[in-house]
Amino acid sequence: MNIKNKLNIIKKYKYVSFDVFDTLVYRNVNKPEMIFSLVEKVAKENGLISPKCDFVKDRIMAQKLAYEISKYQEINLNEIYACINDQYLNVKQQLKEMELKIELDNIVPNKEIKEIYNYCINENKKIIVISDMYLSTENIMSILIQCGYKNINNIFISSEYRARKSTGKLYKIVQNELGVKNKDIIHIGDNKKSDFLMAIKSGIRAIHYKCNKISNLTPKQNIYRSEERRVGKECRSRWSPYH
């Protein structure tokens, strides 16, 4: 990515908005759903679930079901675990807390975007975070703070507002709540539809960030590559939670 070129574009905007996953931060796994595989591994090692349990499949199916029955555009983590297989009935809370911890433990900042963020801070830009994600605002802020993104002016998470970037509705909420004019805001994100096309459709200038995740991770951070085949089919489902 040509950082200098992006900074030249950003400099005229008062508000700079960032996507979270695969933009501000990366995970130390090749696929987002590999987090579920790590939860399964730790849960089995600690005797929390049976060795026969296929938690990865059950967790993905619970998320799919939660979307299907929800009356809102977005769901949250509590609703996902409310839909998980009854065999986890007595350990739902422990599994949910384990997932959040493993999520946090496997997050690293994106150095390229961090450079843009630091420029925005130095230039006194208003920093906004907009994410389509089932985690809570508190969860997302913990991730951002851990990665050094401490100066966030406003944060809009789809699970809290029950509206998504991918439909354009969350962008409208941002515009209305902040009273920001379209000419004063620009959004940066990796998802071509959610972060680029829908932002533009909503009247917001956008930069499509083409992430190169693997090159940003060290060999140590890629230790879970060998597990990818096991969950690959499920990982390619349309229910991927990260946009």
List where the protein language model places each region.
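Short, acidic loop-to-helix structural element flanking the phosphoryl-transfer center
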Residues: 72-128
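Conserved Lys-Pro-Asp/Glu-containing loop-to-beta segment of HAD-superfamily phosphomonoesterases
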Residues: 168-193
